[in-house]
Every structure is written in C-alpha cells, then in structure tokens.
Regions:
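Conserved alpha-helix/loop element of class I SAM-dependent methyltransferases that forms part
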Residues: 29-58
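A short glycine-rich, Lys/Arg-flanked "PGG" loop and its adjoining helix->strand segment in the class I
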Residues: 138-153
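Class I SAM-dependent methyltransferase SAM/SAH-binding core
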Residues: 59-114
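Conserved class I S-adenosyl-L-methionine
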Residues: 153-186
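Short alpha-helix
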Residues: 195-218
Length: 255
C-alpha cells in the first residue's frame, strides 16, 4: 500500500507471531474448551450481554479471529462461521484445535481491510479484541458492511477509549492519569511494536454511520468481582477495571 499501511500490517503480523508463541497458542486450548462464549480480558459471559442473538443457521464472518475460539463457539451453537486472520501462526493454532477437538469451519488468511468474501454473504460479522484495534476503521468498517446482508449485525469488542488514554507508551498497565490527548489515541504506534486504532465514541459513531451502520448498543465492560489480573496482556488491572470500563462492545446493524 502506497500510504504506508502495508508496513503497519507487516509490523502487526510480526508482533502476533511472537504473541502466539508466547501466549495465544497455549491459551487457545482452554478457550476452545469453554462451554459458552465470553468477552474480553475478564471473560464476561455472553449470556449476561446477549449481543450475538440466536446464531443457529446464520452465516458468520469472524474478522481478525486470532486462534478462532469465537468461531468455535459459534459453530458449536449451530452457526456457519468463516474465520479470517492475517496471522499464519494463529491460524495454525486454530487448525490444530480443529483437528484435536473440533468443530471444523473454514480458516482463511486474509486482511480484514480487503476481505476475500462476496458481497452480502453473511448475517453476522463479529470480532473479539481483533479487528477494531488492529485495522484501520475507515477501511474495515466499509468491508464489514459490504459482506453483510441488509439488516445484518456487526458485533465487535475493543479496548475502551479511556484505557487507551491511560496506558503508558513504553510498558505497564493503565493508571489513574491521562497520558495522551483525546484525539492522540485514534492511531497509536507502540514502542514495543504494533500499530493500534482507538477512536473515541464520537469517532466510532461517525465511522459506523459513514459505512452504512445504525448503532444499536454500546456496552462498557467492567471486570466482574473476584479473580486476578489477566495472565498475559498488560492493559489494565482487575482493580482498575472495576472502577473504569476496560473494554467497549459495540453492536450495529447494516442499514
């Protein structure tokens, strides 16, 4: 890509190869074994949110799927998912779990900003801590709208805008001070590698509307009582996330 986005994508792909080696490959075993869908760093159960609806018989695209545990849950619930991710390593992990425990569904190495899917081919587009943070929203949202059928649903989870303002630039978890300006979090190039996008609420509404979506809900996720910090991702502590939202779960409908 002539605008430099290609270099950012390559950087993110390299980062996730390392993350898969250090954490997500081993963690996938437990995620695929969970009896129900959960959301985010602190495993908020889908039954308490109800954002996916009845997925039986639905065609689903999971964008930036990682090790595809969301698609595994969806397939077990009767959906027909296709899971897409840029990371060859994470897809290999997903393939390993498919062979070991099932269920089987298509795994596709692809960029969510340029989906290799036909227009109007799915009823649901979903992403759990994937596409919203690691892809340019001005590019992936129109693609999500393109592949959705009219009235189809988009559900995506990302870090809260507040946490993105409070996470240190070098390392460590979010604190109680704002470390960057409100608009500076839209695109963040972390010193440790990787480029993320954290639009504000106003930005998300504008971007979703421009892509042809109607916003249905925004769920701000806090950490449930009890338990410890996430074993790998240094974003927020559980204590922080009991006071302020750690993540945002957006639900929108294609007009």
């Amino acid at each position: 890509m002539s605008d430099g986005r290609g270099a950012e994508i390559a950087l993110n792909r390299a980062l996730w190869a390392v993350v898969n080696q250090r954490f997500t490959d081993a963690a996938a075993n437990a995620m695929w074994a969970l009896p129900e869908a959960v959301w985010g760093l602190f495993a908020v159960p889908e039954r308490s949110l109800g954002v996916l609806g009845d997925v039986r018989g639905r065609d689903v695209a999971e964008l930036a799927c990682g090790t595809a545990y969301v698609s595994a849950w969806l397939a077990s619930a009767g959906a027909r998912p296709v899971a897409l991710d840029l990371s060859r390593e994470q897809l290999a992990t997903a393939r390993r779990l498919q062979h070991a425990v099932g269920p089987a569904f298509p795994l596709v190495q692809a960029d969510a900003e340029q989906l290799p899917l036909a227009s109007g081919c799915v009823d649901l587009v979903v992403s759990e801590h994937g596409v919203a943070a690691w892809c340019d929203p001005a590019r992936w949202l129109p693609e999500a709208a393109r592949v959705l059928r009219p009235g189809g649903r988009l559900v995506f989870l990302t870090n809260s805008h507040l946490s993105a303002l409070c996470v240190p630039a070098d390392e460590g978890v979010a604190g109680e001070r704002l470390l960057r300006g409100h608009r500076e979090a839209y695109r963040v190039h972390w010193e440790g590698g990787g480029v993320e996008y954290h639009p504000s609420h106003g930005d998300w509404v504008r971007l979703l509307r421009a892509a042809g979506f109607v916003v249905e809900a925004l769920h701000e996720l806090f950490a449930p009582a009890g338990g410890g910090d996430h074993p790998f991702y240094e974003i927020v502590t559980r204590e922080w996330a009991t006071r302020w939202p750690a993540e945002e779960l957006w639900v929108a409908t294609r007009a």
